[in-house]
Amino acid sequence: MTDASPGNLQLALSSKPAIFGGWVTGPTWLGPEEFARAGYDYVGFDAQHGYLDDAGIARMLRRTEHLPLGTVVRLPNADAAPIGRVADAGADAVV
């Protein structure tokens, strides 16, 4: 089932002249929560230049569900399978 409501990233992009975010490049326990606490608009998870795998990204996306943050995932290539996995896991945007 597809949720038609706008995500946090879309809301921030449509309501602010500029948005700010930070990037996580490896497994961490504090990343997304600290970005939310600092007032960032989004958090990105970098699987292209970082040390994150599908499972790590899925865990971190799950941790952001209750946070007022948009989520972006940067993948190393445009293969459909990983794009689908991170989209299914809840990413607001895939780069």
PLM features: what roles do these ranges have?
Residues 1-95:
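Expand to "…catalyze enediolate/carbanion chemistry for C-C bond making/breaking, isomerization
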